């Protein structure tokens, strides 16, 4: 038993290392985008395909992961995924042009898309329900810490070295994980010779790819853009057809019957809400720090580092607490903290102290470390073992979709409210108002005197300055409004978390009832006595 536990822990470390690399890789490029635009001489729209392409491949593969795990087994799939990811990373590092870089990213995405649900499914096999929180807490360490530390690491590399170092550094670690996995990874279940549901696969690929692409473009192009509308509609129709087809199938590729289990359904909804709130912070804070306040990428990343370290420490602890107290106490406390700290971000100004933001972000990370993995585990614990791979595929698919929709929604709110606030400020600068014009003329004259320039030059300077300040302040207010929406989503999650329960107690209750029934005398014996 001791040797088995030791072997499981060694396997868990290997799995986490592979998963950490894959998730870290998703956020490393964000800071490097301007450098890559210069390096490859491409536009911002073109370079964005490094992120969009990765997301689309991930989103298409995750729903197929349940079939892949059952068909090829965990060991072969893990080694293949890591091999593809490492090869793609090397191609990115040595790429002489954008086309090669994009090819490397797509190969990376194939490996990364397989790894997330595979690692989660393996953990569910390694840990029984009564100690599963510990395993999922360690899983959450990679899921939460990697994207949080990514901006800091990439910012440091970009400021001190070439962007290629970000990829070269991952290759040897990937090779080590492959070698260790080859010797230590054993299949939890034997592969089954099942056939690929071709119709389901086509509907899945078309539906999820179209929806994710449409939603990702909506943030920049708007929801009324013809391409956005058409791809979202195609995606929704494709996914609806996929669901109907899978429910009729005797051997579904992705079994939607997992939603018959109430705690799995509830935990999926809560996690989708939390994902929106998480992505809001990851998207809005860098915009505020870099675009508005003027911090460097490294300074922005360093601000998020304490929060990342909090998640590093708290994720395993939250898993242990889950095994002892269940999901509801953790979810309620975590969401209360998340609601309060997210609301605090609705009061940002240009002059908000740096350390105040560091503190609030770290406390917010503390709250979130109690949420995603414990709540996900609460739902997964209700599923029978044969549905584990389908449950993990479904959870990761919903996470991918909610993350994309959340980012797009937050972007739309931010841009729309920024436009609204700028228009409101423009209305207040009424040139027909004598008081306003008197103040403006006085400012122009004092500027001309202090800077020793003509009145015409001073007027141009003052107007330009006031316009810039209006744009700056309207952007900050737009960010505040977007955080208000994120806080509202968290409140909904908090209310829903009150209905969470520990399904392990359900199972224990049924077991005790069954034992009581076996101890009762037979009806005839009871009558005679």
Regions found by a protein language model. Give the residues of each.
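Helix-loop junctions on the cytosolic side of multi-pass membrane transporters
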Residues: 179-198, 244-253, 420, 499-509
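Symmetry-related core transmembrane helices of the 12-TM Major Facilitator Superfamily/SLC fold
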Residues: 167-182, 231-235, 483-498
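Transmembrane core module of solute transporters
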Residues: 7-70, 99-102, 107, 140-142, ...
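Helix-loop-helix hairpins in multi-pass membrane proteins, especially solute transporters
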Residues: 55, 62-200, 226
């Amino acid at each position: 038993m001791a040797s088995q536990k030791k072997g499981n822990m060694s396997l868990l470390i290997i799995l986490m290392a592979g998963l950490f690399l894959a998730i870290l890789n998703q956020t490393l490029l964000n800071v490097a985008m301007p450098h890559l635009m210069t390096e490859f001489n491409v536009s911002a729209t073109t370079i964005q395909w490094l992120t969009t392409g990765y997301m689309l491949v991930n989103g298409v593969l995750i729903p197929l992961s349940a079939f892949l795990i059952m068909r090829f087994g965990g060991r072969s799939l893990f080694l293949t995924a890591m091999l593809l990811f490492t090869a793609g990373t090397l191609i990115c590092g040595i790429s002489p042009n954008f086309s090669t870089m994009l090819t490397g990213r797509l190969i990376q995405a194939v490996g990364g898309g397989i790894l997330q649900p595979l690692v989660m499914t393996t953990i569910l096999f390694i840990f029984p329900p009564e100690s599963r929180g510990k395993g999922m807490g360690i899983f959450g360490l990679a899921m939460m810490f990697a994207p949080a530390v990514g901006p800091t690491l990439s910012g440091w590399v970009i400021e001190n070295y070439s962007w290629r170092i970000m990829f070269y550094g991952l290759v040897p670690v990937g090779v080590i994980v492959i070698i260790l996995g080859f010797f230590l990874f054993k299949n939890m279940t034997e592969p089954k010779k099942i056939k690929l549901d071709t119709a389901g696969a086509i509907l899945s690929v078309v539906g999820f790819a179209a929806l994710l692409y449409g939603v990702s473009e909506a943030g920049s192009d708007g929801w009324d853009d013809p391409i956005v509308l058409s791809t979202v509609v195609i995606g929704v129709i494709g996914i609806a057809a996929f669901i109907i087809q899978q429910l009729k199938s005797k051997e579904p590729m992705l079994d939607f019957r997992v939603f018959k289990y109430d705690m799995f359904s509830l935990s999926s909804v809560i996690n989708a809400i939390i994902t929106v709130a998480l992505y809001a912070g990851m998207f809005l804070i860098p915009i505020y720090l870099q675009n508005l306040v003027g911090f460097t990428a490294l300074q922005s990343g360093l601000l998020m580092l304490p929060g990342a370290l909090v998640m590093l420490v708290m994720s395993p602890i939250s898993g242990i607490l889950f095994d002892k107290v269940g999901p509801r106490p953790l979810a309620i406390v975590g969401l209360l903290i998340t609601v309060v700290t997210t609301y605090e971000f609705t009061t940002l100004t240009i002059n908000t102290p740096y350390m105040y933001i560091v503190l609030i972000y770290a406390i917010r990370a503390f709250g979130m470390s109690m949420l995603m993995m414990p709540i996900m585990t609460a739902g997964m614990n209700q599923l029978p073992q044969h549905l584990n791979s389908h449950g993990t595929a479904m959870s990761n698919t919903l996470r991918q979709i909610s993350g994309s929709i959340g980012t797009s929604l937050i972007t739309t709110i931010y841009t729309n409210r920024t436009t609204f606030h700028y228009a409101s400020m423009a209305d207040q600068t009424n040139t027909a108002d004598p008081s306003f014009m008197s103040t403006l003329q006085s400012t122009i004259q004092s500027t001309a005197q202090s800077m020793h320039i003509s009145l015409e030059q001073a007027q141009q300077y003052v107007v330009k300055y006031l316009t810039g300040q209006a744009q700056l302040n309207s952007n900050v207010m737009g960010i505040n409004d977007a955080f208000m929406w994120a806080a509202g989503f968290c409140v909904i999650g908090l209310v829903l978390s009150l209905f969470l329960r520990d399904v392990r107690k359900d199972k224990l209750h049924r077991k005790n009832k069954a034992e009581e029934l076996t101890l009762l005398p037979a009806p005839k014996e009871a009558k005679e006595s």
